[in-house]
């Protein structure tokens, strides 16, 4: 699974969707073994009550800042092409 970015202990990744069944562009994130799925519009698609709220807020801010880059990566991965890394939250 391609890792797009890492910041403050959060690992953000996106699956290769070539021929996949997912319709909603989204990212996966992991922090201390807890995972969450977030649409590129900021909606939590697979809630995880153990994912820290402060880390979720950071993830939401990062997603908003990098929405265009995330959408471009979604398109690239959907076509089976190489993705690019995205700057971390600073």
Can you say where each PLM-predicted feature lies in the sequence?
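Short, charged/polar N-terminal "headpieces" of proteins
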Residues: 1-23
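Intrinsically disordered, low-complexity boundary segments flanking structured domains
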Residues: 1-2, 25-27, 72-73
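Generic structural "secondary-structure junction" signal
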Residues: 6, 40, 47, 53, ...
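Short, charged low-complexity linear motifs
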Residues: 10-12, 49, 59-60
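Generic structural signal for residues positioned in beta-strands
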Residues: 11-13, 28, 37, 85
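A short, structured beta-strand/loop element
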Residues: 19-54
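C-terminal structural segments of small proteins and small subunits
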Residues: 58-89
